């Protein structure tokens, strides 16, 4: 008889966003005339930039000709895309990378999960709380943890509370850990880390022979010129950090799917025999075995993001979303809501009014305002009493949602 992976049974409930979807569908069925505005899951709403769309069309046309037809591409990604990323995303930051250190994928969510393939099971993992659920759940799924306690913490994971007192930036763990998840600009709190704050983590990782998984999916939304866009802006980070980036929010690729992982050759691990070994070599081996590469049209579209015209158009969309964030942030502050984020990130993290639980506030907004957000407790126990709103909606919907909330909370 085929046996299941029992680790999946440790997961306490359904993935956060499907549970939100279930509740919204139930409400919509019971209230068919209600106009529900969704400011929950971080899905984009603006169309692809014209330059990106043209590259997409041209690439599809290539597939209709014998001369330009593209079949299997390099598993690591086409050099013309990798070089564009190096030249336009990293060189301006003063970061030098080799083409062999960048891997094109079909999205950073998969990468954040798949990277665990090349790390031993007995590594000690440190995760922020609240946190993007994928970091936590994928470690549970592969069997790195025990059962969850009454708070929802899994045995075998070191949780680093992120709260108002520490500015939602985790403090260095007191115990030695081997893998550290960091996400800045942060999802869900919308906060950012300074170079000095990141330097503490890089120094810790190098001193403890640990590896940082740095999720930079929202770096394009940074407005403060003093805030680093990449972990590699920090001295010593190329020895200890793997960086994940995504085209999903930056360029509206949530339905297109493209991301990248940077694995510097200097990031080393230790074999069971105590030998040093490059994670870059392991990730290349894993990639060539389990992945056939992102599609040719998608990579052509991604490369167009880095053209002068493509980036100008992409930046206009980013600015559109950040104006949405300002509208949400300022509107909530007008009625006395305590808010965080929304300045260098497209997420607004708010304190639930009156000490309500996160899910009670979710139900209140849904039933009384017909507005959908994301309960903070869905991101971890330290998210209880908080709530996330996304700036990725249509402008008119964002304005209407904010007015509904303001009227309800006055």
From Swiss-Prot:
Keywords (A to Z) from UniProt: Aminotransferase, Pyridoxal phosphate, Transferase
Protein residues bound to substrate: 15, 42, 109, 132, 187, 292, 388
Residues annotated with N6-(pyridoxal phosphate)lysine modification: 249
Gene3D superfamilies in alphabetical order: Aspartate Aminotransferase, domain 1, Type I PLP-dependent aspartate aminotransferase-like (Major domain)
GO MF, any single term: L,L-diaminopimelate aminotransferase activity
Keyword Ribonucleoprotein: no
Reaction catalysis annotation: (2S,6S)-2,6-diaminopimelate + 2-oxoglutarate = (S)-2,3,4,5-tetrahydrodipicolinate + L-glutamate + H2O + H(+)
Binding site for pyridoxal 5'-phosphate: 72, 108-109, 132, 187, 218, 246-248, 257, 292
GO annotation, biological process: lysine biosynthetic process via diaminopimelate
Family: Belongs to the class-I pyridoxal-phosphate-dependent aminotransferase family. LL-diaminopimelate aminotransferase subfamily.
Self-association state and partner proteins as the record states: Homodimer.
Record-given protein name: LL-diaminopimelate aminotransferase
Organism: Geotalea daltonii (strain DSM 22248 / JCM 15807 / FRC-32) (Geobacter daltonii)
């Amino acid at each position: 008889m085929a046996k299941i992976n029992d680790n999946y049974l440790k997961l306490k409930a359904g993935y956060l966003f499907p549970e939100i979807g279930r509740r919204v569908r139930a409400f919509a069925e019971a209230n068919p005339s209600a106009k529900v505005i969704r400011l929950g899951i971080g899905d984009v709403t603006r169309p692809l930039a014209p330059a990106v769309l043209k590259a997409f069309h041209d690439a599809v046309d290539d597939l209709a000709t014998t001369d330009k037809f593209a079949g299997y591409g390099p598993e690591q990604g086409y050099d013309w895309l990798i070089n564009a990323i190096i030249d336009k995303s990293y060189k301006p930051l003063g970061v030098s990378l080799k083409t062999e250190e960048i891997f094109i994928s079909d999205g950073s969510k998969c990468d954040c999960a798949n990277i665990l393939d090349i790390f031993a099971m007995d590594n000690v993992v440190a995760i922020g709380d609240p946190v993007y659920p994928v970091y936590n759940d994928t470690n549970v799924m592969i069997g790195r943890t025990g059962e969850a306690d009454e708070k929802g913490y899994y045995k075998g994971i070191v949780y680093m509370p992120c709260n108002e007192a520490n500015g939602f930036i985790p403090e260095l763990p007191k115990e030695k850990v081997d893998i550290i998840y960091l996400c800045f600009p942060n999802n869900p709190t919308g906060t950012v880390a300074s170079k000095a704050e990141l330097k503490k983590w890089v120094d810790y990782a190098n001193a403890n022979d640990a590896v940082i998984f740095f999720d930079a999916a929202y770096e394009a939304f940074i407005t403060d010129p003093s805030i680093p866009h990449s972990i590699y802006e920090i001295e010593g980070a190329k020895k200890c950090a793997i960086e994940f980036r995504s085209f999903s929010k930056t360029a509206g690729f949530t339905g297109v799917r493209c991301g990248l992982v940077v694995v510097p050759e200097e990031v080393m691990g230790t074999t069971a025999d105590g030998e040093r070994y490059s994670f870059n070599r392991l990730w290349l081996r894993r990639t060539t075995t389990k992945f056939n590469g992102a599609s040719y049209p998608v990579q052509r579209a991604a490369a167009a993001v880095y053209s002068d015209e493509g980036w100008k158009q992409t930046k206009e969309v980013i600015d559109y979303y950040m104006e949405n964030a300002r509208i949400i942030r300022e509107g909530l502050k007008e009625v006395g809501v305590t808010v965080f984020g929304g300045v260098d990130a497209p997420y607004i993290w708010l304190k639930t009014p009156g000490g309500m639980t996160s899910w009670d506030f979710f139900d209140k907004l849904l039933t009384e305002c017909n507005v959908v957000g994301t309960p903070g407790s869905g991101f971890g126990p330290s998210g209880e009493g908080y709530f996330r709103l996304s700036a990725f909606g249509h402008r008119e919907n964002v304005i209407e949602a904010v007015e509904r909330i303001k009227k309800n909370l006055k």
